[in-house]
Curated annotation (Swiss-Prot):
Family the UniProt entry places it in: Belongs to the activator 1 small subunits family. RfcL subfamily.
Pfam families hit by this protein: AAA, RCF1-5-like_lid
Gene: rfcL
Signal peptide coordinates: none
Superkingdom of origin organism: Archaea
Subunit structure: Heteromultimer composed of small subunits (RfcS) and large subunits (RfcL).
Binding locations of ATP: G54, P55, P56, G57, S58, G59, K60, T61
Record CDD domains: AAA, HLD_clamp_RFC
Stored SUPFAM superfamilies: P-loop containing nucleoside triphosphate hydrolases
Alphabetical UniProt keywords: ATP-binding, DNA replication, Nucleotide-binding
Protein name: Replication factor C large subunit
Keyword Metal-binding among UniProt keywords: no
InterPro entries assigned: AAA+_ATPase (IPR003593), ATPase_AAA_core (IPR003959), P-loop_NTPase (IPR027417), Rep_factor-C_lsu (IPR023935), RFC_lid (IPR047854)
Single Gene Ontology BP annotation: DNA replication
Length: 413
């Protein structure tokens, strides 16, 4: 029984750094953060709060956990997007900020995660409450955000030491994965570790989750096993390009993506073909115009290759960018989570199976109020561990999340 409990511990928690020095990468950010922490230790903080910002999995939360362990401070952690009103924040934090730390701790540190998730329209007084808490605090407060430059966060920026965390380098990610494999007794070649690190694209937490998912129930990970991973790297590099084309205010803005040195026009064609309908619905006119332009671009590319008329490439690029963006009656901008093109899937899965899984994840994610990407990286790995040891219990959890009966097995694969 104890062995099962050990296996159920997420590796992101099991191998979380215990000291600030153990936090991987971001050396400049760590220096700035340590200087700020030391100013608190000396009793003369330069700023009462620090705002750590950067992409997911870059170490923002881990460095605060490491600080608490290293200094024997009590960690009071809240997700700001979960406790968003003035009353809720004050109820959870005000008492903690003005009382002594519990027995065994020499101080406190407060972590407010994802402050950019607070909406000024919906979350009455939440941001102002954070400002007031910072001003009254007798303990260091750390805020984290992906985008600190959101106008609504300006009052917080003025009160905080701003510290930027960047994506973790591939070598650093591989070292962490190699160390985990060694401790877990998992055989994994450097080629496989390299592929996992590439796929994570700077997100160390995602890389560790992927490694744990791959290692589940086995002691050796091969390249063939990597097929179950999502195509995170490719998706993130092309999302902005697709969005630039489909949401451009003017055709010239869409055309600008053709000047990107890394543009893969054939991949762009596939992504546009897959996602035009989602971005332009419910306007049938816009959808028809966009696909018409895309079909002409496809004709140009086919003729270019068949007849070796490379001059046609410029026309094809204009059609698939400016042509698509010129669609009539386009609906107002809305955020769309673009789908990876079916044709480019590593595995030849049927479209029906893919869409069933996406709907299941989207529905389950909505039920627990997280994004689908967060559900995939932070929830599914746990469910798969549970499934390994208690299939009946895992399926019961999925049913409670609203996953349809015919998609239960898909969610655990």
């Amino acid at each position: 029984m104890s062995a099962v409990k050990v296996q159920l511990v997420p590796w992101t928690e099991k191998y979380r750094p215990a000291r600030i020095a153990d936090v991987v990468g971001n050396e400049e950010a760590k220096k700035k953060y340590v200087a700020w922490i030391n100013s608190w230790v000396k009793g003369k903080p330069s700023k009462k709060a620090a705002l750590l910002y950067g992409p997911p999995g870059s170490g923002k939360t881990s460095i605060v956990h490491a600080t608490a362990k290293e200094f024997s401070w009590e960690l009071i952690e809240l997700n700001a997007s979960d406790v968003r009103t003035r009353e809720a924040l004050q109820q959870r934090l005000l008492g903690a900020l003005n009382t002594r730390s519990v027995l065994g701790y020499s101080g406190k540190i407060i972590l407010l995660d994802e402050v950019d998730g607070i909406s000024t329209k919906e979350d009455a007084g939440g941001l102002q409450a954070i400002v007031e808490l910072i001003e009254k605090s007798n303990w260091p407060i750390v805020l984290t955000a992906n985008d600190p430059w959101d106008p609504k966060l300006r009052p917080l920026r003025d009160l905080c030491e701003l510290i930027e965390f960047k994506k973790i380098g591939k070598r650093d990610i591989m070292k962490v994965l190699e160390n985990i494999c060694s401790k877990e007794g998992v055989e994994c070649s450097r080629e496989v570790l390299s592929a996992i690190a590439d796929n994570a694209k700077g997100d160390l937490r995602a890389a560790i989750n992927d490694l744990q998912s791959l290692a589940m129930g086995k002691k050796t990970i091969s390249l063939a096993d990597l097929q179950i991973l999502g195509d995170r790297a490719e998706q993130e590099t092309i999302f902005d390009i697709v969005r630039s084309v489909l949401t451009a205010k003017y055709p010239e803005q869409a055309l600008a993506v053709t000047r990107l040195p890394s543009l893969d026009y054939e991949m762009l064609m596939q992504w546009l073909s897959e996602n035009i309908v989602y971005q332009y619905e419910p306007s049938l006119q816009a959808i028809a115009d966009a696909y018409d332009a895309l079909s002409w671009a496809d004709i140009m590319l086919t003729r270019m290759k068949r007849e070796q008329q490379w001059a046609l490439l410029s026309y094809a690029l204009e059609l698939m960018t400016a042509g698509v963006a010129s669609a009539r009656e386009r609906p107002p901008f809305k955020f769309v989570k673009y789908s990876f093109p079916e044709k480019l899937r590593i595995l030849a899965r049927s479209k029906e199976k893919r869409e069933k899984f996406v709907r299941a994840v989207r529905g389950a994610a909505a039920k627990i109020h997280v994004s689908t990407s967060k559900f995939r990286t932070d929830v599914l790995p746990y469910l798969r561990v549970i499934y390994e040891h208690d299939k009946k219990r895992a399926l019961e959890i999925l049913r409670n999340l609203g996953v349809p009966e015919d998609a239960l097995e898909l969610a655990t694969q």
